[in-house]
């Protein structure tokens, strides 16, 4: 790929200061600059360092435009990271990734509806009565169960499993090895024997969501496990049966959410958070890494720790821990003194 800075400005929406005909071929990082590549600084206070960085162009915050002086090629943008992201999308789309069409080794069942311009990779299995929307890409070794619906512009990477009767809406990305619609962990104890409860619901993943590699989302016991619009789920995450995740939430790696829990809109669960079942987490809640959530959390709270509590309160408790043994000794000493009076 090769584009001029004039074209790059059209992509990023920024304002150029420099040679509009200069050619860019790739993105680069600040730590590994290239003379024909573009990088960015989100923090304007660090922009002075570009004098020693040999990159072809820099995207910098608009707020420093009036005071910042340099002879380097610079694009000023209100949000440099977003401008750089727009360029990355353009760069990524220019690279060939797959051949359109159905590979001859793919297995296509009866009454399958294939949209326009789709891709089904080698050794993938599409069972009966499946619908695949326009421009959807199914990479090799993917399994899609009967009566499943996959919308437009979706990408399912290698070794993804989507079991029967699930609904994947438009522009959903499912990373390699993820499993959608596995049986929920449901058993009833009868005479000291765990009897399996059939899980007859499904999973619905709403539009513009992304599911990380090797993540598992269980089908509902009845009704649906629901992943809302524009939800981002990281790798190695477990979402149990009948969980509901609200629009725009982010769930980071190794989180486990037990059954029938409801997560509101715009929630952030950091890495390795554990969530008990049958609880409600309100809109906009943020929970720090490795926290244990065992009760409802009202909207807008920032929480941390196990058991989870107010973020600042937890930090104060952690700060006090190194002195706890000394405090206990002092308490016992004073108590003994009082008793001997």
Swiss-Prot record:
The terms under GO molecular function for this entry are: N-acyltransferase activity
Q: In which pathway does it act?
A: Bacterial outer membrane biogenesis; LPS lipid A biosynthesis
Catalytic site residues? 241 (proton acceptor)
Q: Which Pfam families match?
A: Hexapep, Hexapep_2, LpxD
Keywords per UniProt: Acyltransferase, Lipid A biosynthesis, Lipid biosynthesis, Lipid metabolism, Repeat, Transferase
Q: Which InterPro entries match?
A: Hexapep, Hexapep_transf_CS, LpxD, Trimer_LpxA-like_sf, UDP_GlcNAc_AcTrfase_non-rep
Q: Which reaction does it catalyse?
A: a UDP-3-O-[(3R)-3-hydroxyacyl]-alpha-D-glucosamine + a (3R)-hydroxyacyl-[ACP] = a UDP-2-N,3-O-bis[(3R)-3-hydroxyacyl]-alpha-D-glucosamine + holo-[ACP] + H(+)
Which CDD domains would you find in this protein's record? LbH_LpxD
| Highest taxon above the source species | Bacteria
Q: Does the keyword Acyltransferase apply?
A: yes
Q: Name the GO terms of the biological process aspect.
A: lipid A biosynthetic process
Q: Which PANTHER family match?
A: UDP-3-O-ACYLGLUCOSAMINE N-ACYLTRANSFERASE, UDP-3-O-ACYLGLUCOSAMINE N-ACYLTRANSFERASE 1, MITOCHONDRIAL-RELATED
Write out the similarity annotation.
Belongs to the transferase hexapeptide repeat family. LpxD subfamily.
Question: What role does this protein play?
Answer: Catalyzes the N-acylation of UDP-3-O-acylglucosamine using 3-hydroxyacyl-ACP as the acyl donor. Is involved in the biosynthesis of lipid A, a phosphorylated glycolipid that anchors the lipopolysaccharide to the outer membrane of the cell.
Record's subunit section: Homotrimer.
Name of the featured protein: UDP-3-O-acylglucosamine N-acyltransferase
Q: Which organism is it from?
A: Elusimicrobium minutum (strain Pei191)
- What is the organism lineage in this UniProt record? Bacteria, Pseudomonadati, Elusimicrobiota, Elusimicrobia, Elusimicrobiales
